[in-house]
Amino acid sequence: LGTNMAGDPDAVASIAANLGVSPDDAAGMERVMTSAAHVGAWKWCFWIPSAIAFAGAIGLVVFLRDTPTSVGLPELEGTETRQVKTEKKGAEHKAFLMKYVFKNPLIWILGFANFFVYIVRFSVLDWGPSLLSQSKGVSMSHAGWLVAMFEIAGILGMLFAGWATDKWLKGRAHRTCVFCMAGAALFVFLFWQLPADAPIWLLFTTLCAAGFCIYGPQALIGIAAANQATKKAAATANGLTGLFGYASTLVSGVGLGFVAQHYGWNWAYVGILGMAVVGMLVFLLMWGAKADGYEPEAE
């Protein structure tokens, strides 16, 4: 979508055949060339995502509910916070937020970790096509597909990370994030070391493996923050950690571009790899933490 194919004889011939237009038909071939050029099609690259986002917003307004009790359901077992009644709009609620969010070192650790997770992720999303074409000799069309597959692999990584957290790590999402960041660092390193003439399938495999690993922490940080801050401060905790995530675009966007332009893509790879390693180390700071912050309140 949005790619000018008018210069590709095979594409033009295919469109003409599909439309039943003879090469001798000047008016018909003009329509074929217009179709091949995708005149104005680039606009749909904005309209389609916007329409999907708008439909999602309508769905949230219609179907999203506040709490289980608001629809007549019981509270989830183990999520009671009896000691601090946050329904009150006052000093008591502020004290709750200060204790469970702003003075909670685990929330700040998750925020700092999110900063590095987003750097690794957006380094590929923002610079992936340029990085692949200039450092690995991949055509821009193939580079676009590789970045798209990086995202798709990330979706699978999210699902696996969530399942593994519940299955093997007893809900300790921060521990899953340690393993995911280690995996992301490993596959970024392997991708970097591949020669420019490496088979496309090998580039595909290593890049997708990195995406599989890096999207796990991106999904789990919000869950971990909500669990540590408890349901009464989950939104505030997610807002704080999200602030760190989006602040990282200064590094992944401007910083990485500066490094690549002035020092080459090898140093850009070093930067991405370094961010993955630092992110892993930050997650390690809370390795011994419990899965959530509810237990002290369940007395």
Q: Residue locations for each model-derived region?
A:
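Interfacial helix-cap and linker-helix signal at transmembrane-aqueous boundaries
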Residues: 1-14, 36-37, 132-133, 164-165, ...
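Extracytoplasmic gate region of multi-pass secondary transporters
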Residues: 3, 99-159, 218, 252-253
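Symmetry-related core transmembrane helices of the 12-TM Major Facilitator Superfamily/SLC fold
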Residues: 43-62, 267-285
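Juxtamembrane intracellular "pre-TM" segments in multi-pass secondary transporters
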Residues: 71-109
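Cytoplasmic membrane-interface "Motif A"-like loop-to-helix N-cap segments
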Residues: 166-181
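Paired intracellular helix-loop junctions of major facilitator superfamily
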Residues: 170, 225-234
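C-terminal ends and interior cores of transmembrane alpha-helices
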Residues: 182-196
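A late C-terminal transmembrane helix in Major Facilitator Superfamily
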Residues: 231-263
